Every structure is written in structure tokens, then in C-alpha cells.
Amino acid sequence: MKRILATIALLVFATGAFACTSVIITGKATKDGRPLIWKNTDGGEHFCSQRITYNELGKYAWAGLALDGTPQSAWFGANEKGFVIMNTSSSNFFTGKKKSNGVIMKRALDVCVTLQDFVNLLDTVSLPKINVASHYGVIDAEGGAAYIEVKYLSSTKKLEYWVYDVNDPALAPDGYMIYTNWSRNGKEDMGGGYIRYDSATKIFADGYKTKEFTPKWIIDNLSRSYYNDLMGVDYRAMVDAGLYKGKGFIPDSDFIPRITTYAATVVQGVKKGENPLLTTGWTALGYAPTSVMIPFWVAGGMDGLNKVVRGNDNNHNDLNIGENNAIICDLSLKLKTQVFSVIRGHGPNYLNFSKLYNAEGTGYIQQLAPVEKEVYDMTTAQLEKWREKGKIDKKELAALNDRIYAIVMAAPVYHNDYTYKYGKIGKKGESNE
């Protein structure tokens, strides 16, 4: 009996790698008519630094989630033409080899303008060392929006793919589509992310009723959600209702944010006819429940990226930021080590929820909420002015970045004395699926 229970426990609490969750929302489902594309990025490591980088070595410049200025792969990005791409890894397309999903995205950001350009790329890409098992999400400045399931066929050495148009009411009647890690064309009931898919479906359905969809709403309600649809349990709601009576620790089981989470990113596209350089990214690097959403644009180049999300120029020894790591990411991960503080045995399968959210209002999510609100409100007000002008003013962007930097660096929760439980935060994380 003990063996059976132990086996069940391992199955319940096992943490899967590459457990990404995503959505594409067309303009018909948002209040302002602009599309949104979101990905909660997970990988194989528990604690690794991520950053936003700028790349101008291809046909088109782009900014996004990649590890350096000359990356071979990208994991989420937007280019100067308003082409935006992300992916979630497929775990029921069986390839048997290391995946090259990010290589395709980097190539797409370099050369694509439209969704059709990306489809054409899949037809023509050279494949000597590329292996793909992925769901690519794409939006463009012309209103294109689709998921494309892609797998590599070793028998033909070509890519096989299926396009799911989010503008098609037969496929997405409410104007949005969700993907996790199982493919509609993969092996049935295999793969992962079914519970996260159901949780996201419930949350988005509730938001759709009043067209609540904004970048901030998505990060708050999805990337900081502790709702498990299979169990019918929402830990944040339980705390708010005074119903949570636990000791603080809960299983880190099938939530959208998890110990393997690297970042949460939303990109807001443009309406037809708008300047594609107004395409706006928002990223909560590290672990979204302990991070702050920071905006980014392609228009300002590398200097236009906020200092807290790009590679760190100055080693902030007072805050123990790793050399060339993104400041906000390492600050977030320092708090994350306090959430996942039990490292012996199966301890990493549990998180200290009371550190994140509690009845006293002192959880990390609660302390960072006013910081993020100030950043978000300030940015959206400036963005509206740029939309009226039809372009981003680089001097105003620099001033905005300075204000955001000051707000984030002044957050008291980031200035407490924390001890790393897992050693120094590293720079790994190339497999952000």
C-alpha cells in the first residue's frame, strides 16, 4: 500500500519541463481592437536568468526573449514590421531528437512581415540540422493571427504543418485560441498541459464576458494564477474569502506559473494602418508572481530597452545581480528562492504560497502590485500619446525608461537580505520551449 501511495505522489507532484501556456487574442475580443499574444515560458531549469535583447543582423530588426545580441534562437519576439512570434513545445509529436523550435523563430523574426511569410518559410527552410515539434503563434500588422502546429518528418526531411486561423469563427468563435503542450494532430491523450489548458480556458472565458483582455489582465490572471481546474481550487480566491487555513505550503502541481517558469510575456499588436513600430511588448522576467511587467519596443534599438530587462551593464553587487544578467530577472529569482525554499528530497515540488499571497497583504504579489500598476499606468498614458503622433519619440522613451527603472529599483521588497537556496543564479536557459 505504501508503494502505491508513493507512486501516486510522484505522479501528482512531478514537475514537467517545457510546460508553456499561451494564447492569441484577435482585436475583435479586446476593447481597443488591438490583438494580443501571450506566453508563459517554461524550461528545463528551475532558476536561470533571462533577458530581452535587440537584434538587427537580419533583414528586419527585432526585440525579444533571447540570450544575447547575436542569438541562434529566439523564444518570443516582435520585429520592426509588426510581425510577432512565440511558441509552445509539442510533447505528443514524437521526434526523438533535440528540438530546434527557437531556431525557426529567430529566422522568422529576421525575414517575415506577415503570417503568410512564415508559412512560406516553413515550406522553404533548410533542414540539415533542424528538428521541430512545436506550436508557433503568430500575429502581424495586417490582422493575421494563427497557430501553426509543426513537426519534422524524418522520412521526407521536410516540415509538416497545420494552420489554425484565430480569425476563423468556426475555429475561434470568441476571437481567441489557447495552446499548451499537446498538439491537435499529435498522438491522442499523450503530451502535456491538459490541466493548464482547462484552467486557462476557464479564466479566459470569464474575462471574455466583459472584454477584460489587456496585457496587465493576462499577466495578473494567468501568469500569477494558482487555480487548478481539475481540483476546482483557486488558492488566491481562498485567501481572499478567508477560507485558506493551511500551513503555507501547497503542491506546485499543474499551475500556469511553476518552478520551471522563466518568464511571462505579452505583446500587443497594432490595428491595421497603425505604425508597426508601436507594437508593444510587456515582459515579467523570471517568475511572474515575484516580478514586474516591463514594456519594450523595437523602435528604440538596444539603447531603448529598459536597463532592468536587458543584459546588465553594471554589476549591482549590492543586489547580487549576476554579470550580464537582467536586473529584474535576478531580483525576481531571489524572491522565487524564498517561495521554493525546501530543497531536500521532494521539497522543490512544493511552494510556500503564504510568501506570495496572504490575508495580511504582505505577499510578494501583493507588495509588487502597486509597483507594477504605477509602471503600467505611466506607460499606457505615454503610449496613447505616441499613437496620436503615429510614432515613438526616442527622447520620451528614454525618459520613460528612466522613470520605470527608478520605480522598480526602489521597490522595498527587492532590498531585503535574501539567501540563495540553489547557489548563484546562472545564465542557462537556451531551451525555453
PLM features: residue spans?
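C-terminal, well-structured catalytic/ligand-binding subdomain of enzymes
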Residues: 21-22, 27-71, 77, 83, ...
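Loop/turn elements at helix/coil->beta-strand transitions in domains of secreted/extracellular proteins
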Residues: 32-34, 81-83, 114-116, 132-133
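Alpha-helix boundary/capping residues
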Residues: 11, 122-126, 207, 225
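Proteins synthesized as precursors that undergo proteolytic processing into mature forms
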Residues: 92-136
